[in-house]
Amino acid sequence: MNEPTIAQPVLFADLIDRPVIATFDQPHASSDGGAVLLKAADRHVGVVAALTATVPDARAPTRVTHGVGDLIAQRVFAIACGHPDGNDGDRLADDPIHKLLLGRDPIDGGRLASQPTISRFEHTAAPRMLLAMSHALADTVIARHRRRRRRGVRLITIDLDGTEDQTHGAQQLTFFNGFYDHWCYLPLVGTLTFDDEARQYLVAAILRPGNAAGTAGAVSLLKRLLPKLWRAFPGVRLRVRLDGGFATPEMFAHLEAAGVEYVVAMAGNAVLARHAEPTVAPLRAIVATTHDTATTYAEAAYQAGSWAAPRRTIIKAEVVWHPGRAPRDNPRFVITNLRQTPAWIYTHVYCARGDSENRLKELKHALAFGRTSCTRFWANQLRITLTAAAFVLWQELQLRADRTALRGAQVPRLRQALITIGVQVVRSVRRIVLHFPQAHPDAATWARLARALGAVPA
C-alpha cells in the first residue's frame, strides 16, 4: 500500500511575537467533519440506495473490494463535499470521515476506491443503466416531496433549462457551438416547484451533444416525468415553463395532448412585432416625455406558419430608456394556454422561472457540474447523474436549514458552515466520537440541523 505523502512542516519565524510552526501530522482527522449531515440527509432521501439498485455488477463477488454501492456513495458524497474529480479519490482514500460515510470503520476500515477504480466504474456506464438511474433519481425526488407535502399539492411547475458545459478535450459528442463560441456539451436540467414555494427542486439532468437542438430530449423527459407526477399527486395541475429555445411545434403538440398548462417564451419575428406595435407605439411617446422606461402588457392570437391553429400570445410591450442613448423597443412574447391577465401571467408566472437559473449556478460553481472530462459520452452522463444526486442531498439540507440562520443559503455558504469543519475522530469499542473545534462559528446551527435529521442529545 502506498503511504500518503505528508507535507513538510513550515516555520513562520516572525509572524507574531514567537515562531509559528505548521505541520500536517494529526492522525485520524478530517477537514470534512460535518459531512455526516449529508449521510443523515441521504437516510431521509435515499438517493444513493436508489441509484445503486439500478446498476448491475457483473464482477465476481469474491474478487470485489469496492462494491457498486460503495463507488456510487463515495462519488456522491465526495462531490457534495467539494471534491468532484476522480483524482480526489486517491487523496481521500484514508480520510476517516469519508470512510465513515460509506459505513466503514473510520480508523481501521479499508481504503476507499482509487482514481483508476473510479474511472473503470465510470466507463462501464451504458444507456440502459443510465436511463434506469434517471428514473430512480426522479422517483426518489418525487417520493421525498410527496412525503414532505402530506397536506397535498395543487400545482407543480416543471422548468426545463438548457445550459452549456464547455469542454477542453476530445470527449465523445463534444462539438463546436456557434452560439457559445466554443466546444461544449449542452446539458438539460429539469426542476420542480410545488405550489408557490420559492425553491425549485432538481428532478432530472441529461447530458446532450454540443450540437443538439434546444429541444433535444425535452419531450422524452416530459413523457417520463408527467405520469410519475400524476401518480404521486393525483389531481394535481401540472404547468410547464420554458424559454424560447423550446418553442417548437412538437413541444406545443405534446403539451396540449398531455393536457398540461404551459408558459413558453417565443422569439420575436416580424409578425409578432406587428402584433406588438399598437401597444408599443404609445409607450414611445410616454418615454419621450418621462425619460424613463415604460412597460405594459397585451395579448394577441398568433399562428406561426407551422401551427395548425393560433395560440394565445402574451405581449410584454416595453420601451427602454438609458441616459445618453436613444429609446429602444424591447418587446417580449410568451405563448400560453393560461386564462389569467397578460400582466399576471408574465410577471407572476413566466418571470418566476428566472430563479431556476440560480440552480444551474449552484450546480456549476458549487458542485462542478461541468466536470465532464471522461473520454466516453456515457461516462460523462454518469458524472452528471451523480452530481445531480449530490445536489439532491444539498437541497434536503437547504430544506432543514429554512428554520435556522442559514435560511436561503446556497451550497457554497452551507458547505462552509456545515461541512468543511476540522474534526478529530476517536473510536472506542462502543462508539465513535467526532471532536469539532469549540470555536466553530456555526456550531449551534450545525447541532440544530443534526437534530432535525434524527440526532438526539448525547
Predicted regions and their residues:
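Short amphipathic alpha-helical "interface-anchor" segments enriched in bulky aromatics
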Residues: 41, 89, 346-382, 386-397
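Short, glycine/acidic-rich hinge or "gate" loops at secondary-structure transitions
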Residues: 90-91, 105-107, 238-239, 401-411
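Acidic/histidine-rich, metal-coordinating catalytic segments
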Residues: 161, 236-247
